[in-house]
Amino acid sequence: MNTRHEQWSLETIKEVYNTPIFELIHRANAILRSNFPHSELQTCYLVSIKTGGCTEDCAYCAQSSRYQTNVKPEPMMKITEVLERAKHAIESGATRVCLGAAWREVKDNHQFDRILEMIKGITNMGAEVCCALGMLTPSQSEKLYDAGLYAYNHNLDSSEGFYKTIITTRKYEDRLKTLDVVEQSGISVCCGGIIGMGETTEDRIGLLHTLACRERAPESVPVNVLWPIEGTPLQDQQTPSFWEILRTIATARIVFPLSMVRLAAGRAFLSVEQQTLCFIAGANSIFYGEKLLTVDNNDMDEDTAMLNLLGMRHRPAFSRKQEQPCQSATC
């Protein structure tokens, strides 16, 4: 398990975030190289197995039934269709397949049974499986574990203070409780947030601090950049500067030396050169495929060309390192 190895205060994380950029990148890169094989990148493929019609009011989400967006509710995908998509992605280089469903929480019904079969099928193909299914009970989490689920995504989105301004239908403590349920069942936790929603730098630091104060660090920390969607309350938000994105990536790497730091939604905003800087600064995971739920992502062929250009290798599935993280102040 990726256990918490040192105490991080808000002030300490703030100092890291505000470090002069060359020093920040150097420190983050040294930590990355100390804990992961060089030039290795995890490629994850995301499948929206149940799109639209969610009852939650997340201000950033096109899948909420409360907003007038171009996303229409769709029935849950068939098992065979999901397995076909996963097989194609794995053949194209993906080593983790993420299954996302637009609903508030898991129900004990035939849909959950289908998800368990999807997990078993994809795991048998040799890929890690991650699910983002909302809140769940200990019993459901145990069933997911027994089916072979590798990781469970449940983002905190932002700091607890800012969270209240973007979501009212689910409490911050509900999200923390879900993380506890997942951890207790033995499933790895994937948890990060979104930048560019109107939050402050202190909110971004607060999110990292909340995660750093947990008993176990997340196995993966996705850093998403808001993709403003017409019809949502955040449709007019400005995209954060590249330097804000880079600082967030580097700080996450330093605070979570053994975690996968994922350059997630919003990567399509970045040039190959900017993405390269993010990889140097600690990002070692991306989403691979043209679509992320309801928003565009980089073309898979373009990503393959980028990896070849940079001399990067696909990180094999089930290859999480067991070494202890670097303990020195400078690594």
UniProtKB/Swiss-Prot annotation:
Keywords: 2Fe-2S, 4Fe-4S, Biotin biosynthesis, Iron, Iron-sulfur, Metal-binding, S-adenosyl-L-methionine, Transferase. It catalyses: (4R,5S)-dethiobiotin + (sulfur carrier)-SH + 2 reduced [2Fe-2S]-[ferredoxin] + 2 S-adenosyl-L-methionine = (sulfur carrier)-H + biotin + 2 5'-deoxyadenosine + 2 L-methionine + 2 oxidized [2Fe-2S]-[ferredoxin]. The keyword Iron applies. GO terms for molecular function: 2 iron, 2 sulfur cluster binding; 4 iron, 4 sulfur cluster binding; biotin synthase activity; iron ion binding. [2Fe-2S] cluster binds at residues 98, 130, 190, 262. CDD domains: Radical_SAM. Pathway: Cofactor biosynthesis; biotin biosynthesis; biotin from 7,8-diaminononanoate: step 2/2. Residues 39-264 form the Radical SAM core domain. One of its GO terms (biological process) is biotin biosynthetic process. Its EC number is 2.8.1.6. SUPFAM superfamilies: Radical SAM enzymes (SSF102114). Catalyzes the conversion of dethiobiotin (DTB) to biotin by the insertion of a sulfur atom into dethiobiotin via a radical-based mechanism. Belongs to the radical SAM superfamily. Biotin synthase family. This is Biotin synthase. It comes from Chlamydia felis (strain Fe/C-56). The gene is bioB.
